[in-house]
Amino acid sequence: MAEVDLESDQIRLKCIRKEGFFTVPPEHRLGRCRSVKEFEKLNRIGEGTYGIVYRARDTQTDEIVALKKVRMDKEKDGIPISSLREITLLLRLRHPNIVELKEVVVGNHLESIFLVMGYCEQDLASLLENMPTPFSEAQVKCIMLQVLRGLQYLHRNFIIHRDLKVSNLLMTDKGCVKTADFGLARAYGVPVKPMTPKVVTLWYRAPELLLGTTTQTTSIDMWAVGCILAELLAHKPLLPGTSEIHQIDLIVQLLGTPSENIWPGFSKLPLAGQYSLRKQPYNNLKHKFPWLSEAGLRLLNFLFMYDPKKRATSGDCLESSYFKEKPLPCEPELMPTFPHHRNKRAAPAAAEGQSKRCRP
C-alpha cells in the first residue's frame, strides 16, 4: 500500500515484514521513468480516444514531441486498461508509417502518466478542412500507399486498429504518413474472440459492426480504408451518417441492399432483423466517382465488399493496378507543405466531437 503526502511531496510505502511505513527517496520514486517536468508543454494539439495530446519540447534533447496525457479521471485502481493496451501494443510496434512511442513519463505524484510520441506536424482531418485546393490524385495515392503499408504491418502482427479515420492519420513535414491513436486497438488470434461492436467512428464503421457482429477481423480496418480513400478523392466524407440507422441507409444507397447471395450469414447477424432496409439493387460508386479510372473503381468496390471474408486485404490493395497507373503516386518528400495548424492553435476542448470530419 502507498500513501502520498501532497503537502510535503513525499511517497510512503507500507513495509510487509515490519509494521509501519518507509519514505521513498526522491531519486527512486520514478523508477526508470523520467518526470514530465523534463518536458516543456508548448500547446495543446488535440484529444485522442483516451487522452489529451500536447506539443512539447524535451528539455534534455531539444526534440519536439507529442505528449499524450493518459485519462485517469474514471479510474480508482491504477492505469485504465485501454491505456495499458495502447502502451503494450505501441512498445512492440516499429514501422515508418506507425506513430512511435518513445517512452512513458510520469507526473509529480505518480497520479498521472504521459506517453511521449514522435511528433507529426499535421493530421489529415485538419489538412482537409484547411487546404485551399484538394489533394491531387497522385498525392492521394502517396498517402494511401503509406497507410496501407502501416496497416499491413499491423495486420501481420495480428493487431486490428479499430478506429481508422482521417483525424488519426498524421503527416510529417517530409510527407511521411503515420497511423496514430491505438486506444481501441486489439491483438487478435485464432479462433477470433468476441469483441464489442461499438468501435470505429460511425462514418468509417463497417456494415457488419452496424449489424451487431462480435466477430471482428482486419476487414473492419479495410472498410475504413475504403472510406478514407473515397474521402481523400472527393475532399469530403463519403458516408456522413448521423445515427447507426442513417449510416446503414447511406451504405445501402451507395452499394445496394445486401442479401444472403452476396453476403452469406448476413440475415443471421444480431441486428439484421431490426432494420427495414430499403430495396436498392444498384451499386452507385461509379456515379459517385464518374472521373475515377476502372482500376480505382475496382479497388473501391473491393474495399466495400459487404462480405468481410471477400473484402480486400492490405496486401491486395498494395498490389492494385490503381497504384501502378498514371497518375503515379508522388514521392512523400514531394508532398506539398502546409502551415503548421497543430503548432499554432490550441485544440478545442472536445476536438473530435466538434470537427466536421470527426463526428460520431
UniProtKB/Swiss-Prot annotation:
Protein name: Cyclin-dependent kinase 10
PANTHER family in alphabetical order: CELL DIVISION PROTEIN KINASE (PTHR24056), CYCLIN-DEPENDENT KINASE 10 (PTHR24056:SF508)
Compartment(s) of residence: Cytoplasm, Cytoskeleton, Cilium basal body
GO CC entries: ciliary basal body; cyclin-dependent protein kinase holoenzyme complex; cytoplasm; nucleus
Catalytic activity: L-seryl-[protein] + ATP = O-phospho-L-seryl-[protein] + ADP + H(+); L-threonyl-[protein] + ATP = O-phospho-L-threonyl-[protein] + ADP + H(+)
Top-level enzyme category: transferase
Primary gene name: Cdk10
Renumbered residue ranges of the record's region Disordered: 334-360
Species this protein is from: Mus musculus (Mouse)
